[in-house]
Amino acid sequence: MKKYILLAFLLAVLTACSKGFLEEIPNSNILTPEQAEDFQRLLDNSEQVGVTGVLPQLAADEYYISTEKDWLASATATERNSYIWAKDIFGGELEINDWNAPYKSVFYANNIISEVEKQFKTGDLTSALRDIYGQALFHRAKAYFDLVKNFSVPFDALTQYTDIGVPIRKDPSIDYTSQRSSVSDCHDLIFDDLNKALTYLAYDTPLPERNRATKLAAFALLSRIYLYRREYDKAEQYADSLLNRYDKLIDYNKVSQTSNTPFTKTNDELIMYGATGVYRNSGQINSSQTVFVDSTLIKMYAPNDLRLSIYFINNGGKYTVKRGYNGTGLTPFNGFAVDEVLLNKIECLVRRDELSQASLSMERLLLNRYKTGTYNHVAFADQQSALQFVLQERRKELVWRCLRWDDIKRLNKEGKGIVLSRRLGDAVYKLEPNTPGYVFNIPQDEINRSGIIQNIR
């Protein structure tokens, strides 16, 4: 019987996916799993739950397309238009995964949360169900953060109450239409879910397969969110919450420099596996040899920096990116790892002028990234130069993880003045700081279905 219940649930999900997650449909009575193992099986399906958008990778400055001909040959209009920050990213393309995939995660999470909460009332809540409840809350928070940062304006503490966010869905049914909430309301839901998840998640160490949410993953996500919000004291607080429990780094001297898949997706540094959707131009090891790593970024790596040979393939002076912390997966890694959290911590230390501690923490990271015996300790002399050094290390370490776009947005809100530029033939395309081009369009088929407000771009 349990298998039939699960099958019915999955069929209902697939039906909902094909019609769009915010579309009003006539009948949404859904049979849902009733046992802990069924819930866990759904949450473990990484192709359905936890997938994040890849538009931030397509729009960021970590790569270039060398010729206009190659750009025109991109597989989709979305790839072409994201590259030049066109007003209409999707060019008429429908069923955009950057919008649909996070809402699919929300849909799964809402159904699991609802069913587990029914069992709260009976008092028959096993430790496994408590952990599953925490995992579902985590996934809903992660999905909403992905949506609100991609489809709303860059976060601003002063305007968050009037800035338009994304539709919030907490009810498991799918037969009603939601309008867009404020950015503040979206972030409130995210924090409520994560704080509640921390009381239910069972594990505060990484699990062997690195595929399930833990307290560590919640700490990492909270640190990432607060960094994006430029609330550096809280970003550091949650970075510490993780690093005080788990802080393993990989010694890159022990990693193959010649393998195209130098890492496994269960490596010691990993907190939780996570992948994005995929386009050909965002895929790792781009088989068409048309997408190359930004040359300015490549020049940042010193000769003894092992990341140059471990992260990239040198194709006659042009570099392509290897597969990363997703192991053999082709999509960009957007999960959680110790290196990101440590860099969050270091940046926060610099911002509160704890330069000595910041330089020691940076040394710990870079001793594991340079050839043995070649790294020279960098003593930070002043806050400005220290911050510049740390932000450059973020670029070098966290490449191809869909984090650079979010960093540009938050840094430009602080006046960094980063201007993005692309050249195709005789045409030069630019994206100025704090302009509407940093907000992605909502797919037009979603606008047509639900009538929600489109973004100005």
Placement of each model-derived feature along the sequence:
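Sec-dependent bacterial lipoprotein signal peptides
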Residues: 1-16
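Membrane-proximal, proline-rich intrinsically disordered regions
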Residues: 17-65, 239, 307, 373, ...
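Short, surface-exposed recognition loops and adjoining beta-strand edges that mediate ligand/DNA contacts
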Residues: 28-33, 59-74, 153-162, 203-280, ...
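Extended ligand-binding clefts on enzyme/binding-domain cores
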Residues: 36-40, 46-47, 51, 185, ...
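Conserved, well-structured interaction surfaces
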Residues: 78-151, 181, 198-202, 329-336, ...
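Inward-facing hydrophobic residues that define packing positions of alpha-helical scaffold repeats
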Residues: 106-109, 187, 194, 239, ...
